[in-house]
Amino acid sequence: MSTEPEASAQPLPAQQSAALFRLMTWLSPAFPVGAFSYSSGIEWAVEAGDVEGAASLRDWLDAMLQHGAGFCDAVLLCYAYRATERHDDASLLAVAELAAAFVTSAERQLETLSQGRAFIEIARKAWNSDGLGRAVAACGEAIAYPVAVGVVSASHGVSLPATLHGFLHAVTSNWISAGARLIPLGQTDSQRVLAALEPAVIATGSRALAASLDDLGTATFRADLASLRHETQYTRLFRS
C-alpha cells in the first residue's frame, strides 16, 4: 500500500468548503433554533392513532413533504433566496409576509416564526455581513424559518439547490426525532425512516425549484387538522 497521496484526491476550493461548513452548521440539530420543541402536529397524530410505528410515520411524513408544509416551505425558501440574491426588497417583503401568513394554525405560525427569528439572530451574531443586514431589514418584522434560511444562504453565496435539500433534510430529521420520542422508535428504525424518505426529499426539492407561488397549497387535511387539534391537546411534550 502506497503512503503517497493520490493525485485524484483534490481538496474542495476554499469558497465551496466555507459554504459547505456554514450550511452544515446552520442546519445542524446543534444550531440553537429550538426545533426540538416542535412536532408540527405529529404529537396529536400519535395520540389519535394515525401514527403508530415506523411505517405509518414514514407515510405521514412523505405526505407532509410532498403535499404539505414541506413543499410549501421549500417554495417559499426558493423565492426568498432569489429575491435576496437580486436585492429585490419589494419581492422579499412580499414573500416574507406570505410565509408568515401561509400556515395552518397558530402553533405552526409560532413554530416557523420562532425558529426564523432565532436562526437570523444567531447567524447575524456569528456570520454577519452588510448584505445580510440589508436583507433582514427588507423582510419586515416577521421572518418565517424557510425565509430566514433562504436569506442567510443567499447572503453568503451558498447555492440554492444545496440550501434547499439541506433544509428539507433538517426539517425531515426533526420530524422523525419528534416521532421517535412520541411513538417511541429506536435509533435504527428512525434512520430507516429517514433513508426511506430520501426519494421524497429529493423529489420535493426538485419540484420546489421549478414551482411558482401559484403552486403553493396543501393536500394533507389530516396533518393540518392535527396541527389545529394539538392546540387543545391536554397532555403535551411539544409546542406544536
UniProtKB/Swiss-Prot annotation:
Location within or outside the cell: Cytoplasm
One Pfam family per UniProt: UreF
Keywords assigned by UniProt, alphabetized: Chaperone, Cytoplasm, Nickel insertion
Cross-referenced Gene3D superfamilies: Urease accessory protein UreF (1.10.4190.10)
GO molecular function, one term: nickel cation binding
GO terms for cellular component: cytoplasm
Keyword Metal-binding in record: no
The protein's assembly and partners: UreD, UreF and UreG form a complex that acts as a GTP-hydrolysis-dependent molecular chaperone, activating the urease apoprotein by helping to assemble the nickel containing metallocenter of UreC. The UreE protein probably delivers the nickel.
Function of the protein: Required for maturation of urease via the functional incorporation of the urease nickel metallocenter.
Family membership noted in the UniProt record: Belongs to the UreF family.
Name of the protein: Urease accessory protein UreF
Source organism per UniProt: Rhodopseudomonas palustris (strain ATCC BAA-98 / CGA009)
Gene encoding the protein: ureF
